[in-house]
């Protein structure tokens, strides 16, 4: 059975070019980049090249790129550094719809005495910027807002938010894990202090990430150890993955405009056809300010987990929320924050496409999903009691 993979916000296929770039550094050029000998020096030069490739994708300088193990580490390092470099400040400003990497950390820090404000979002998953500005206080050490939501694809105006934070002398961090490689980002044109990237969301391997730290920003290391990453992140470098991430960044920079236009057309076709063919369905979140690859659709009176299981019988892979929380039976915290009705939130499915998806795959999903929803609604007591007459809000 062929797999149709529409869960790319959870993880993505490693590009063939990325794998080819990595392979020599497992068994041939396996030296430690910190070694004095020329064998290690070859590896160090290749890491410098990867750092340049990553910096070019986001309009940064190579010195501003710190390689980490993942987006979660980058988020933790950024927020903890901001608190460590501003010990007199005890307030953190974030949103209710952040990824668990930020949300769970903030909950942990609140138990340690920090005051955390989680800004609400509207029905489209967007922030009220007036409320954001009012929430900035002299005690605020750091603002952490995602650039793009992993469940709905909604884009936050982080560049404007960073300016407002800077006006009050507050550090600004953004979790850009879902945004990098999908939309243009130029750190030279904004004042964001720190930005998180995860390799496996842009066709690099798992276990590698980046923390961008703007030149001049005070930084307190999260992992203490050796001198690696200019003493900003201890630990022997994950050379093959760093090189793979560099190559993935180069590919993303080259292909972004053309491929994302194609991916958006496929996403829009999937969305339009499903809404037309399946009654009592709706898109969750803004349809204007969002990633080109993501749609989150609710099918009322059915369980998202049941939809996923039946789609899986046809080889269709999607998600009922963040891959870091989808093991829970509770509705998505993102959709709850948006005020999505319970009967809709429980039946939400996130489809997230990549450059490797084809129109034939999208047509197959459009063909199969309506009958899956019809079958499940036939088993739903709410649907059978006549609630199907309800109008989707």
List where the protein language model places each region:
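Pyridoxal 5′-phosphate
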Residues: 1-393
